[in-house]
Amino acid sequence: MEKHAFDPACCLGERLQTLSRAELTALAETICRILTERGTYHGGIRPDNISRAEDGTVGLGAPARTDTKDWTTEELEFMAPEVFWSGSLDASADVYSLGLLLYAGVMGGRLPFYPDDRAPQPEDMAAALRRRM
């Protein structure tokens, strides 16, 4: 298996919100190290595209698809605006997505502009996504 390859059996997904701040920090550091080692931009940093084994081993899934507009909701939720609007993939897109990942981890899975007083409904999530884009 390729070093830092994504392992679907260890998909981070909703487990993101169970990580401690120390674990979130270690996860972010590892993701940055992986991207630096690869020497490329990813554009697809999101919970369902990260694997984290019990021993802390981290893997990244496929990079962002910039040649399509047929994205999943999860892809859109963590996508940088410049990737959405122009397909522009650079370090700032990865910083943006990593920042959202950390925000969601600290905030119990909530993303910016979700309502504070209740669980977000689909229309709340769509409105929040529009504000972030």
Question: How does the language model describe each region?
Answer:
Residues 17-32:
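Conserved short alpha-helix within the protein kinase catalytic core
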Residues 105-106:
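Hydrophobic anchor on a C-lobe helix of Hanks-type protein kinase catalytic domains
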Residues 35-52:
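Catalytic-loop of the protein kinase fold
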Residues 83-91:
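Conserved end of the kinase activation segment
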Residues 94:
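Conserved catalytic-loop aspartate of Hanks-type protein kinases
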Residues 1-10:
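Conserved short submotifs of the Hanks-type protein kinase catalytic core
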Residues 70-82:
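Conserved activation segment of eukaryotic-like protein kinases, specifically the C-terminal portion
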